[in-house]
Amino acid sequence: MSPAKVDVTKKADPKAKALKAAKAVKSGQIVKKPAKKIRTKVTFHRPKTLTVPRKPKYPKISATPRNKLDHYQILKYPLTTESAMKKIEDNNTLVFIVDIRADKKKIKDAVKKMYDIQTKKVNTLIRPDGTKKAYVRLTPDYDALDVANKIGII
């Protein structure tokens, strides 16, 4: 078996190859690689990329959250101790046991909605047994004794 004959004419002339490459560079067909970026800082900060907002096919939570504290849950019951009665008579103040999660604004709104009375201010404290007590001071145009009568404390 003799080795396969290589066609000598198929090999390109080096001079012709160089001329062809020079012509391509001049015409702009060959794109140069971008120059390497010179880093001057020691630390590398990852560049911010585009964050596309999520478009879920369905919500993660199927039921909408309901309000856990409505007005009836905020005010548990009025306090009818001797000291509470003294507050009603002397300071125009009603005393309630309220939900531990209720804040002063929620207590004020609950009293306004349930008893149709304006409150001047609300003071709260947490009792040693873990319940929250609210002192609801009424405005001068409301009498705490009449409101207590209407509620059924007295």
Curated annotation (Swiss-Prot):
InterPro entries in UniProt: Nucleotide-bd_a/b_plait_sf, Ribosomal_uL23, Ribosomal_uL23-like, Ribosomal_uL23/eL15/eS24_sf, Ribosomal_uL23_CS, Ribosomal_uL23_N
SUPFAM superfamilies hit by this protein: Ribosomal proteins S24e, L23 and L15e
GO CC, alphabetical: cytosol; cytosolic large ribosomal subunit; cytosolic ribosome
Keyword presence, Ribosomal protein: yes
Highest taxon of source: Eukaryota
BP terms from Gene Ontology: response to cold; response to high light intensity; response to oxidative stress; translation
Record family assignment: Belongs to the universal ribosomal protein uL23 family.
Protein name as catalogued: Large ribosomal subunit protein uL23y
Species this protein is from: Arabidopsis thaliana (Mouse-ear cress)
Primary gene name: RPL23AB
